[in-house]
Amino acid sequence: MFFNPYLSGGVTGGAVAGGRRQRSQPGSAQGSGKRPPQKQFLQIVPRGVMFDGQTGLIKHKTGRLPLMFYREIKHLLSHDMVWPCPWRETLVGRVVGPIRFHTYDQTDAVLFFDSPENVSPRYRQHLVPSGNVLRFFGATEHGYSICVNVFGQRSYFYCEYSDTDRLREVIASVGELVPEPRTPYAVSVTPATKTSIYGYGTRPVPDLQCVSISNWTMARKIGEYLLEQGFPVYEVRVDPLTRLVIDRRITTFGWCSVNRYDWRQQGRASTCDIEVDCDVSDLVAVPDDSSWPRYRCLSFDIECMSGEGGFPCAEKSDDIVIQISCVCYETGGNTAVDQGIPNGNDGRGCTSEGVIFGHSGLHLFTIGTCGQVGPDVDVYEFPSEYELLLGFMLFFQRYAPAFVTGYNINSFDLKYILTRLEYLYKVDSQRFCKLPTAQGGRFFLHSPAVGFKRQYAAAFPSASHNNPASTAATKVYIAGSVVIDMYPVCMAKTNSPNYKLNTMAELYLRQRKDDLSYKDIPRCFVANAEGRAQVGRYCLQDAVLVRDLFNTINFHYEAGAIARLAKIPLRRVIFDGQQIRIYTSLLDECACRDFILPNHYSKGTTVPETNSVAVSPNAAIISTAAVPGDAGSVAAMFQMSPPLQSAPSSQDGVSPGSGSNSSSSVGVFSVGSGSSGGVGVSNDNHGAGGTAAVSYQGATVFEPEVGYYNDPVAVFDFASLYPSIIMAHNLCYSTLLVPGGEYPVDPADVYSVTLENGVTHRFVRASVRVSVLSELLNKWVSQRRAVRECMRECQDPVRRMLLDKEQMALKVTCNAFYGFTGVVNGMMPCLPIAASITRIGRDMLERTARFIKDNFSEPCFLHNFFNQEDYVVGTREGDSEESSALPEGLETSSGGSNERRVEARVIYGDTDSVFVRFRGLTPQALVARGPSLAHYVTACLFVEPVKLEFEKVFVSLMMICKKRYIGKVEGASGLSMKGVDLVRKTACEFVKGVTRDVLSLLFEDREVSEAAVRLSRLSLDEVKKYGVPRGFWRILRRLVQARDDLYLHRVRVEDLVLSSVLSKDISLYRQSNLPHIAVIKRLAARSEELPSVGDRVFYVLTAPGVRTAPQGSSDNGDSVTAGVVSRSDAIDGTDDDADGGGVEESNRRGGEPAKKRARKPPSAVCNYEVAEDPSYVREHGVPIHADKYFEQVLKAVTNVLSPVFPGGETARKDKFLHMVLPRRLHLEPAFLPYSVKAHECC
């Protein structure tokens, strides 16, 4: 029992709580007898905190000061309080001389001349009547936090207008027309001499004016208005921070130096240890230093309790936060321990030397008293939820972390805390960051899903939800702190069936968490102080595991390397995708050449988010439309930009005029109003340089020769295909010849690319003008090569790790160029470039295939690469696939041959890879000579830097269809596969296990492999006459065993779990007959924990007739006979892939009334009707649907073995296994005592 004397308010001095005498904090307000006026606040406290074991909440309004108890000492919660736990104070004297600091975060704001900030006249002159101030947050070499306020950077863009004075008047008029709020600004217009990057031309843009505006907020509004009205404008959306970084060559993540500055001791804008003001010309970068100082990090987790017993919802006043755990640690530095690299310590990157806040860096905030949580854990006890949240925010402000991390904190923890503070307790959360609200401080979330919560609440009034937006799309902004949520990081870095913290901890840390169900948390919490300690340990371990993940994955180093390379803030690397990276890099490269980037208005698009703050929002959570073309996620960091895709056309994805039967594409792309699949652009001039329409093919593939290959198959691929095409052929905006533009005199200076539909795009060669894209890529490729060379020589693990992150940043950014030019609603689309890249890549594949066909089978050619022992001698003539192979004993052999005969043929081409089947050469020889073959092809066909590389050799390969194959790689254990059920997250483990066993038999058992080859050459009539080859019986035996396991309940529920991703709000699904949607509805009806958008929803298919929890109601207790579900003699072939349909029809005859509904056959029941939560199935012993699971087994095995099944016009490969499997009847449990065990041979 916890006696809470502060619910009634007004208790002072030595109050007794739980039998413990409370001592007042020395110098606190209690002893004075005077209390400053305090607004009333709502206290919400669980009743069990005061009366052990009791449920419910106590709500009370009080006017007393908020309190906190730390080690039996009472503390008043206020902004000027001294935090009670031990921490290393940073007492800084006056700094003299230049300051060298490392910057990790930046923000910009607009200040006015009458700003209350303590700005000296030297810098206040830049604020007449308003001006931009750029705040650089960072740390000095000695670890002190610093804020550098940079004044004097104006916002500017370019506009074509003949009269300078008249344009100034136009700007003034437009300033009165832009949307509110409108603020004062100063403007200057000067002539400029620049050349547009779009289209080849040597003449500057005529009548170009540079419009410079002191106020970035108004500059953006005016520029957008001019763009909307049709004015030719350039670089309108470039914010002042980007201008400073590019114009002054400053880094957004790295070391800088400020030589002349004013020290701020009074009237500070930030809470940093050091704050200085400087002019834009006083800030310089320190190049060639990628080291890090020591930065403070915070990992935290929250625990909530629902008043209704369901999953907590922040908007409900009874769903309170009961505990918050925090782990304080440091990252950066110059040693392995500093960087979090295991080096003789506990492997977590946190030692006693790194603890800077608290006894051990571990903190727990809890409502009520709490037992012993752990040694040296600092526990803070609060009388109510409001005081708990206020204490945590004050702790956050005092600790002032540079990096904040957690697991799913973007979409749950931070959102939950801010929602409670803002909407329930009316607390301005933005005053807890490193900048006050008036100085541009922000502490909020940006979510793209509008009205999601309201829609969800309307759909499920009895349910709650914790994530109203996709995790990857939710953006968090805290001025001076960078948020790195490890949940989307893990999703981007790993390929896992689920991304729960426990799963990631096992994968990365080899640790398992002590799980505590969200249903058990309230029971333990209200039990007593020891129960709250148990919940506290559970809460704290999550924060500790996330800290360890943070230090193991080291994503912050990757993001920092990209921020430094792309010249954008670290926050934009994490949240804003790849488009902004390429745009800023291109802007920087063009600035050196006096090129400018045009803007193009597309109706319906929104302005990309920037760092600027003019008016801080009052709400902590903001929902707006996603930014087209730049709505990114952490996953974008680790993936190559995929070829553009759109919905297939009516011609099955082949563009008009292709006229080729040997290849196809996965998508057709077009510019103009007729584009398909929702991909389109406005009818302006930025699509094709005046061309009316452009269509092109992407992700080109050669149709595979489907089948099972027991011969070696070599795979060759192009290294960095798309970047190398840009560099080799000088493709760029600046080299594109546009109608009406300049043309070279000599036709030999023009490189032409003709698409399948006859449209031709032309580019000037490098001898006329070097491509800006090509030079930028060349610089990065050379830089990456130099970094990798340094890695090979580097012995220091810290330095080597930083170099590795740098080379990875270079690789990822290079590969993003193709997507940058091809995204129609991107920042600078140019489909002629993207179409040309795709066309050239297609031609390269075709030329490679033709060269292989013409040369690789010729003895003279092979003699230059292979020795006599590399050949397979004695190949039977009957082994060719053209010959028919009957079962054993019926073949007609033509005898052997000692001729060294080699046959090479391209059997598949996929975007940048070529698969070549070799007959007559050993796999070992191909592995040894493959690089030489690739080098020879490159030398004969391509120009630098295009390079064909040897990748691997399949000893045997099952080519199923496009993008789907399985093979055994020479020199590697296991199988390499793509696009099959074994690597799909949706398939259950049982199906994967059976399929894996079948494939193991096929690739590891020589008899089975030979039987598969023979089977592929048989007709269906021959199979009916002679049966399947003997070696294939082993596969059939495994399938029979799987069938028996299912019908006799020998399979664990865990191995039968299926899953689907909840990709959007459940109310936005048009189909209600989806299994995972049905499961969510059943969970909501039972008030159970619901998945977040982006999570996988797990379910099991149960036996038909079992009454699971109905949608909108709870279980009615109907019982089902436990045992085996009856099964007909033959396996029903009904296609149950479709989740919809299958609704029973009333059995009517003429005008007769409806009779009793006919019962569906078991396999005809739709999946959504029998889908149920796995935990519910285990707890209630619900039998599984054996029919459906065995049907899935047969489909999965058919998918991987169908190339070897007999073909023909009358053969149905999907029914082949049904035909050859022996039939078996599985009895109901009541008949089992009367059955007789029999032996059956398969």
Swiss-Prot record:
GO terms for cellular component: host cell nucleus
Molecular functions per Gene Ontology: DNA binding; DNA-directed DNA polymerase activity; nucleotide binding
E.C. code: 2.7.7.7
Region (Disordered): 14-38, 644-665, 877-898, 1108-1163
Alphabetical list of SMART domains matching this protein: POLBc
GO biological process: bidirectional double-stranded viral DNA replication; DNA-templated DNA replication
Annotated Polar residues bias: 1110-1119
Comp. bias intervals (Basic and acidic residues): 1145-1155
Principal location: host cell
Quaternary structure note: Forms a complex with the ssDNA-binding protein UL57, the DNA polymerase processivity factor UL44, and the alkaline exonuclease UL98. Interacts with the putative helicase-primase complex composed of UL70, UL102 and UL105 proteins; these interactions may coordinate leading and lagging strand DNA synthesis at the replication fork.
Record family assignment: Belongs to the DNA polymerase type-B family.
Function statement: Replicates viral genomic DNA in the late phase of lytic infection, producing long concatemeric DNA. The replication complex is composed of six viral proteins: the DNA polymerase, processivity factor, primase, primase-associated factor, helicase, and ssDNA-binding protein.
Protein name: DNA polymerase catalytic subunit
Organism per entry: Human cytomegalovirus (strain AD169)
Lineage summary: Viruses, Duplodnaviria, Heunggongvirae, Peploviricota, Herviviricetes
Gene: UL54
